Every structure is written in C-alpha cells, then in structure tokens.
Amino acid sequence: MEKTMFAYSWHQTDDETKNWSKSKESLRIYGITDDGKTICLIVNDFKPFVHVELPSSINWRQKIGGQPKVQKIMDYLNFILGDLKPVKNRTIFIDKYKLYGSNYVQTSPGVFQRKKFPYLVLFFESRKHIKNLEYKLKNTVDVPGFGKIKLNVRETNVSPILQLCVERNLPSAGWIGFKVEGRGALAGYGELVEEKKKFTDCDEEYVISKNYIYSIDKHVPVKAKVMAWDIEVYSEDGNFPDAMKPGNVVFQISCIFFIVGTSYKQKYLLTLGDPLEYTTTPINEEGCGKDTIVCKFKTEEDLIIAFSSLQKREKPHITTGWNIFNFDTTFLLKRAKLHRCLPNFLLQGFPKDQLGKEKEIKWQSKAYGTTDLKFIDCEGILCIDLMDVVQKEHKLDSYSLNFVAKHFLGSKKDDLKPKEIFICYREGIKKEVKNIVIHPLSNNLNIYLGKEEIMIENKKFKKPLKPFFRIQNTGKLVSDEDDSVFHVNYRGEVFSFLIAVHNEEKYEIKTVSEFNNYKNAYGTYTLSAQKAMAKVGKYCVQDSVLVADIFEHLQTWLSFSEMSRTCTTPIMTIHVHGQQVKFFNQVYKYCYDHKTVTDKETYKVDEKERYRGAEVFDPVPGLKRNVVPLDFASLYPSLIIARNMCYSTFVDNDDIPDEMCHVMEWDDHVACSHDPKVIRKNAITEELEKLKKIANAKKMYTQGTRTYKKMMCSYLVMENTKEKTEMSKHLKDLDRENNELLNIVNKQTPGYIESIKKKISDLTSERSEITKKLSKSVMCVSNRRYRFLKEPKGILPTIIQNLLDARKNTRTEIKNYKSRLALLMEKENKSKEDIDEITSIENLLPILDKRQNSYKISANSMYGATGVRVGALPFMPIAMCTTYMGRKSIVEVSQYLKELGGRVVYGDTDSNYVTFDDVVDKNVKVGTEEFSREMKKLWNHAIEIAKTISKKFDNPITLEFENAIYFKFLILTKKRYMYYTCGKDGNILMDANGKPKMGQRGVILSRRDNCKYMKDVYANVIDKIFDEQSENEILNGVVEKMLNLYTRQIEFTSCEKDENYLKNLIVTKSVGDYGGDKATFEPILGKNEKGEDKWKIGNYVVPLITDEIIKTCGTNGLPMTQNEIKDWYLERLPCQVQLEVKIKRRGHNKEEGQRLSYVVTDIGCKGKQSEKIESVEYFKTHSKVLKLDYGYYIERLIEPLDQVFQAVFKNCQEKETIYSDNFRKTKLFSIFEKRGKHSQANFTKELHKLCSVTKPKLINEIKSFSKPDLVFV
C-alpha cells in the first residue's frame, strides 16, 4: 500500500552517541498528510559516503596476484581505520569527472576528450567515521607496493540529508510517497511502529528502507500547524530586563495556534496572577478576550514548563515569533537555567523523551550583514523568526512589530511601553486578605475585620477597618525589634496582635514574612491587579496575533517550502544560513546525477584577487521626456549560459586552441596611472599649475597658455615693447632658426586675468568631481585572459538554463490557470465540479507563484556565489568574466541604440534609458488624446528596437522593453533618478492618493536614513518640477517648508510632544555588528571587503590607537585606563552605534531589528553628531530640557536640493551661495526667543518681517545664480 506525505523536516542522528565505534547514522523524516496528521519515517539503512581520489597515474584495474591493484588500497584503509572502517561490501571503485577544470586531453590531432579520474566511494556507519578517515589521510601515506602516495578525500562536507535526497531524488520540502505493509519490514517496506514502542509523538511512525521512498508530483496545499508566541517580562530596576536577575520574571506567554490557509485559530495566554477575563468578544478594554484560553500559574517555573507542555500537547509543525531568536528564546533559556528546570523546558519537539538543543549560528555576508541567531533545535518543529524573514526580504524604515503590521496589514497593536508593562506587573501581583479575625494580645480587646462594624473595648465603629494588609493606609504598622509582635496605631490607640483566623482555623503569625506567606496562600488578587494583568495579557496576545497574520499575509510557509524544493535544501537551513549552502546543494545534486565530484579543495582563492563591477555611464543631468527603459533579461545568468562559463569548462591547457573556446581578455585599470580618469586628472593638475603661475606672476608680460599664429622671432617684434628686458628672458630659449612660436601676453589686457581665474575654477571643479568618482582601491592589471570551452555545455550554465526554463514554464502554467479561472468565474450556473476546480486553481496559483519566484532567485544568485573568497564553491574567473561581459554588453547596446536613432541618457549594469526624439513629439500635453497616440507609437517602437538589438547577441541574451514609459525622467547623477510612468495608452500610473506615482532610485526618497520631513520637502520640489511650475513657485515652496520647520516651535506650546510632528523628524539608520551585548571594543586584525588587512571591531574598520595617545590622552594627562581606551574606540564607530551603546548603558531596551531610530538635538554648541542624537523615547521623556536641532535637518537638505537645481535650472552656481546666512539657525532663534519676552503682537511683527523681507532676499539670491526657465533636453 502507498502512502503520501509532505516532507518538511529532516533530522540526522549521528551525534546521539558519544561512542565513536558504535555510532550509526539514522535519518528521520517528518511529514504532513492531506488531513493534517504528522508522520515520522525512520530510515536506518542509509549510509553516508565520501569519495577518495586515487592517483591517476596508476592503472588501478590491473590485476596483481589475481586481485586488482585498488584492492591493496582498500586493504590498507581497513587496516589503518580499524573499528571505524567502511561498511563491508559497499565500497565502489569508479571513474568520475572533476568539477573544477576542463581536464581535456588530446586523443588525436584536433580531438580532445574529457578525462575521468579514479575514485573509491566509501560508505560509513556514521559521519564521525568519515572525520576519522579524513584525519588519517590528511598527509601522504605509505601503502605497501605503491610507496608514498596522496589519497585525497572529497565531499566530506556534504550532509547525509542531502546525499539521501539526491540519491533517491527526493524534495527536501515536498510531497513524497512510501510503501507500507506488503511483504513486511524485512523487505524494506514501511512497518508501522506500535504506540508503546514509538520514538515520537507523531500520529503515525514507520521504520522503512530508503529504497521505498520516492518523490511524487502533487500540488495540494499543506495544512501545516503553526504556533505564534510572545513573552512579557518584568524588570525590577525598570531597565532593559536582565534574565540573570532573579526578580526579572517571565510572567506571561501568549500562544496562537493556527493552520495555514484556514480560519482556525486557538489563543492561549499562560500567565502569573489572575487576569480579568472577558466580558465582550473578542477583546475588550479590560479583559483578555472571550476566545482566549487563560492558564494561570503560581510560579514562573510552572509557567515556563507549561509553555513546553503546551507545545507537546498541540504538536505544531512550525513555531514563529517576532525577534524570538535574539530575545524571547534566549531569555526563556536563561530563566529555565536559573530555576534549574532546563531539561523540562527543552522537552519540546516530536520525540517523546529527547531534549531540544540550544543552537547559535553566526555568519556575515555583503547582502545581509551580520546574522547572529540563537534558537532551540526541536526535532520535527521548524523555528522561524519572522522578523529575520522580513529584514532579509523587505527594506523598511523600521522593523518593530507595530511598524511592520501597519505596513503590511494596516493594523496596529496597543501602545504599551516597557515601563507601563513593569508597572502593570507590580500592580498585578498584589493580593488582599478578606474575612480574617485578628485576636489581640490583651483579652479585653476584640478587633473584627471584614464586618460592617468594629468592636473596640465595647465601642462600636460604623466604618470598618480596611483589610489587614492595607491597614497602613489608616494606621501605622510597626513591629518590635524581634519582629514577632505587630502593633497597629489606629485613631491614636495602639493595638497588638499575632493570631489570624481563616475558615475557622487559626494561624499564628509572628513575622512579616509569615504574614506575606499567609497572604500569598489565602489572599485574593485585587480588582486593580486583575485589570493590570489583563491589560498586559491583551497586549501579549495581540503581538502573537499580528505575527500570525503577517506570517499568513507574506505566505511565509509557501516561500520557504518552494525555495527548499528548488534548492534541495531543508527549510531550517534556508532560514538560518545564507545563499552559499543553497547554491552548493544545487550544484552537488547535478554533479551527483552526472558522475562528477565537487572537488573544491583543488581551487585556492588568491586573497589579493579582485575584479571590477558593472559599467555605469556618466549621465547628463537634467529633466528628460519620454524615456524608454531597455533591460537585459537576467543578464548575468544569460551571459554565463551564452559564454558557457563553468568550473568544468575553464581552460588552462595551452594545447586546446582558441577556436574551441570563448576567449575573454581585457585590462583592469581602476584609479591607476592607466585609468583615463587619472590621466585626465593629472593633465588638469599640470594645466592648473601653469595657470596659477600666470595669475600669480608680478610682471606685466608673461608667456601665454594658448597657441596663436606662428611668428618669426626677430628684434622687430620688440621695437614697440616697453620692457625689452622682460621680453628677452622669454626669448632666451627660443630658436630663431626654427621659427619657434612666440607666445607672450600682456596681463593688462582687459578680462584676461578674469578668464584665467574662471578657467582655474572650472578645472578645479572638474578635478574635484573626478577625485570623487575615483575608486579608493587601486587596480592595475593588464591583459586578463580567460577561456571557456564552447562545447560541451557546462554544469553551471545547464543548471541556470534549467531554472530559467522551469520559471518560464511555471509562468505559462500560471497564465493558463488564470485564464481557466476567469472562464469558470464567468459561468452563471456553476456545477460542483466547477466549484471544486475553482478551489483547486485558487489553491494552486499561490504555490506556482512562489515556485517561479524561487527559480528566479536561484538563477540570479549563481553568479554571486562564484565571486566570493570564502564560500561553498568559489571561482573568481567566472565572476570576473561575467562582469566584464556585462560591461561590454551595455556599451554595445548603447552604440546600437545610437545607430538606430536613440539617445542614451543613462546606462547602469544591465539597463539603458533612451529617448527617441524623432519618433514622438516631446512637447505634447500629458493626458490628451495626442499624448496617448504618441505613447502608443513610442511603445511599439521600443518593442521593435529591443527585438532588433537582441538579434545581435548570442542566445539567450535578450534585451527587453520594460513595458513602461517614463514620460518625465529627472536624472541627477549615477544611480540617482526619479520618474513618472505611463502605459501603452498613455495611462499614468497613480498612487493611493490619486497623484502620479513617483519612481525613484538613490535619492532622498528611496533612502531609509532620511526623515519624513526631508522626503516631503524633496518630493514637493520634484512634483512641482514635473508639473512644470515656475522657478518662483518651486523656490518659494522650498523656503516656505524650511521656515515652517522653525515656526512649528511657535504654533505649539511644546511641538516636540506632538506625535505626528515628531515622527516627521525621526531618522533611522542600520546598526551593524560591533559585538552587541558582548562587545569588548578591542580591535582584531581582519579583512575588509577587498581582502585587505584592517583592524576591525565587528564589521567596522577602525584605526589602531597609538602608544603616544595611550600615554598622554588619559584623564589629567595621565595614561589612559582600559575603559578610556574602549571609549576611544567607541568614538571611532558610527554615531548610531554609539547611541545604541549609550541606550544600553542607561539600561534601556534597544529597538527590534538592526535599525535604530533617533532625532537630532541642539546641544548649544558645535558638537559631534554622536553627542547630538538621542533615541525617540529618551527625547520624549526629557523634552522639557532637550530641543531639536532644526538646522541639522535643513543642512541635510541643502546638497540634495542643490543637486536638483543644478540639473534643472540653467547655470545654477554652487550651493553655498544659494543658501546664505538667512538660513542660519541663530538668526532665526533671535526672533523666536522674543516670544517669551514680548507681546504676541511684537512677535507676529517680527515673524512677518522675517517672511516678507528675508524670504524675497533668499529668492533673489537663488535667482541670481539660475535662469528662470525649466529646460527639457
């Protein structure tokens, strides 16, 4: 009988025994059935294997004494390995190809054949045995009969899970089938394990042979069960909670269980205290929610253990949360260790009695920065930190849960600050004691609490005493020195007591601690305590609900499962590791199927090896009309295919002629003496020196710089010269006989010196621009030359082609299914079969969409994986040749476009932006019928141009029209531009507000480290430019916005407390790795991105402190202490890093994610930015003494706006002349300060003076450096 399941989690058991000789590999596969049940397949007959490469100079098949030579190698290996020798009767001798190098040999003139190499494939019981083999063979070995030879062990880093998947062609996440029952377990069929013998808590468990597991083609949504969770913790001192402090308890844990793709949701709140439960549905202001199951516990230890028990009972396949890898999981682990209940806490996952493992993974890459993850590896459960997923896939200003929820869902959670949570906890644990009789020491005194009246010495008091533990509010509670007798001072009388009665049972109370114990045992939580706990409980549950909703909204499960299927990589590996492992697994799978060994050890990366990046054209800044974007489709993957660039096709054999190869040769000259930019810079420097000599010369006559007509050098020339002696000095070196040029100028010639000075200014600016563009890293390599075989097709090109073809086919499937769905939906009377088909298609479309996206990502990542120094399969020649061909291709396209009547306004990497002025009329009015006709004409022309140019390139390199026309396109510099988009019929792409949607790259609008105020001012300027408003209107708008920033301080009593206003001024920046909580601020020698040796703290390069500084720069001139040295290094890190350290030192919590939000304050002097920035929460708390530095925000706008003005307005001069002292903060403050000293009328008068006098001055000043017309070029 056949069964099917969706395999989602794999586990290898190699490390479950410490005895190496008894260690055996076993694999467990966890899957989900159609009806949501969990199955575990236990595979005991799989053996991990490695390849041992033998010297190719020996004929190993040749027999000696009746046995092949290779048998002697096996005998030797068995001898040296002893009990850890390979599995008997499983060793294979085989000839295979190598991944690295073409390895072609000439068999006859002009005929070459790819060479195979001899390998022993050895199977072992455990990977530990493989490590032993690797250790034994790390050096040359002396084999009897062969002498000293080198036996190289290959593919030791391949996991058994990957080996099983490629051997049986199984998806690491996907539907698989397996056979059960039949002829019984001895034949390898799956044998159902009895309940009492089961290793796991899965619904079904089978022991099965790997030979009866196979992949099946099935597209059914998987009903995976997910648990979203969150914790709430307390801090005794109000600072960021330290888990090692006993009082900082975890007092609430929310868990939301849901099934992907269904409406099922079950909410749990595990809590200390007694939260007020629901009164309305689903959540009211005071209760936890009617649909929330509240589980109450007396101690934190019980709470933590219950959290693990809940997982064991509910059996989720996935657990997820927000920032759980960096906070929640770590905090719970530390608390469990503190309470000595760690084993109970780690009892998670599907195995009955096996503990989860604490894991910490840290790695870094250029794409993702530093990744530091701490989680519990629970077998059968995938642990997903959703914040980490969002950080890697989406660029947002902030990664707080609230911000992300607003961005994706449009919803938010209750705004409950950490300190409010701490207050709620303190209130939430308060108890009161009711109906207790207090017996005094004196017999003539009776006090009864909890009744309508009190008898004291036979006197009645209508107002009863409050409960005992509150008696301090009306009387004074004191105790004797021995702390055994209590005295209550009530209305001037002192009463003593020591006995409490509860339920007619007396309890003797002698100390305060005994009373507290009594209160905890028999007291009840106050109503305010219940409300406080409920308030936090609601907040805690909301967090988990938002995580669940974001998980569903982003289709996280489908994304991971489809990427896993494409890359043959387990889901958890994809989540916690980078691109390299996915790349390696794809290559290994192909190599396994084509008898090739991934011998990456044969290639060593030169640490100094570097290569150039993509080609980017210098644009002509300005506002353009009707720009057509033409892009290469998947340029780098296509180049690898077209030029057959691969490890296996790389040619380093001179015997192979160039005719058989794709030859690529070029020079790399970057910032060296051969670089055209450097040559031009040096020429400018020489010319500037000559010009400065002329300008600074004191004599009237001097040698000129320009070539005039030739003239005879004779004394007739000097007849009318006043200063003949000066002339003679210049004539000494002139050769009269050769008629040398006489080039002497009178400096008093009108305008001559002014022209020289202008020339000096222009050349200085040009040299400055060149210097900015020059790379700081010099590269001077002549005659790079690499060759790749034209045939046969390489491994890497084949893999990429397969991925691109698969994506194309999948997208075709999507298109066909959508068409079919549309037809079905149009039917008025739908049959049951139609409804079933509609449901099936709707379920299938998201799967196919995520699948085609996984193909795209995988294909595009192939190139990057080859160009790393430390990686799975590095190979620099592929990366270098790919970027070279990319540079060459975009230059060729620009030339073809010019030949076809186009004008390239900008080019970058794989894109060209071009105008066809002869095809359309650029002056037609937007939105008219004529505009629509012109755009349709341009659209069709662009398609034809793309097809024509594509024919000039090798297959599959294709130039594509982006199906968009940028009818307004403002280009500023390289990688900085903005545009409005329209479609084929001239329909303008609009945003949610009904305005033309602005696309942008590289400018303020697209960079996350600019505040909203700056983006609004900038966008306002660009919108007006695109709307063709006048210069006056544009400049007026800029000045108005800037003045409004200051006048805001007047309009509101305390503008800094205005939430909406303050949000406009918040800056966010990313914080890289500097050591975090374990930071020592001690630099270590490492490598930068270019492979150069640099001193680093985390990811940041820092200078090394000198002995002189250490000796003299301490307090009072004394030598620096260790803390002062650390602070010295801290000051060399970016300001946002310094702010984060400052926040932590204050004991406050850091924001979630790698980005930090702050505002810039005015400290009253010119200080470092690190001294001026403050966290938003800290600023709000201290807004009475802290003020915003408005000047900072304006200064940050000057350069970007000036860049726009120079690009749009004619002859716009330098920015420092546009923005004069009228914008100086001190000048404005001199007016603002009068608000508190004079009447409102005086203030309004001064403000009017500022607006009516200062602003026109500013406008005129800007006008003097620009012409009023907008110029469309």
From Swiss-Prot:
UniProt keyword terms in alphabetical order: Coiled coil, DNA replication, DNA-binding, DNA-directed DNA polymerase, Nucleotidyltransferase, Transferase, Viral DNA replication
SUPFAM superfamilies, per database record: DNA/RNA polymerases, Ribonuclease H-like
Family: Belongs to the DNA polymerase type-B family.
Pfam families associated with the record: DNA_pol_B, DNA_pol_B_exo1
Function: DNA-directed DNA polymerase involved in viral DNA replication.
Gene3D superfamilies recorded: DNA polymerase family B, C-terminal domain (1.10.132.60), DNA Polymerase, chain B, domain 1 (3.30.342.10), Helix hairpin bin (1.10.287.690), Palm domain of DNA polymerase (3.90.1600.10), Ribonuclease H-like superfamily/Ribonuclease H (3.30.420.10)
Segments crossing the lipid bilayer: none
InterPro entries: DNA-dir_DNA_pol_B (IPR006172), DNA-dir_DNA_pol_B_exonuc (IPR006133), DNA-dir_DNA_pol_B_multi_dom (IPR006134), DNA/RNA_pol_sf (IPR043502), DNA_pol_B_thumb (IPR042087), DNA_pol_palm_dom_sf (IPR023211), DNA_pol_type-B (IPR050240), RNaseH-like_sf (IPR012337)
Name of the protein in question: DNA polymerase 037L
GO biological process: base-excision repair, gap-filling; DNA replication proofreading; nucleotide-excision repair, DNA gap filling; viral DNA genome replication
Organism: Invertebrate iridescent virus 6
GO molecular function terms listed in the Swiss-Prot or TrEMBL record: 3'-5'-DNA exonuclease activity; DNA binding; DNA-directed DNA polymerase activity; nucleotide binding
Top-level taxon in the UniProt lineage: Viruses
Coiled coil: 679-837
Gene that encodes the chain: DPOL
EC number: 2.7.7.7
Reactions catalysed according to its record: DNA(n) + a 2'-deoxyribonucleoside 5'-triphosphate = DNA(n+1) + diphosphate
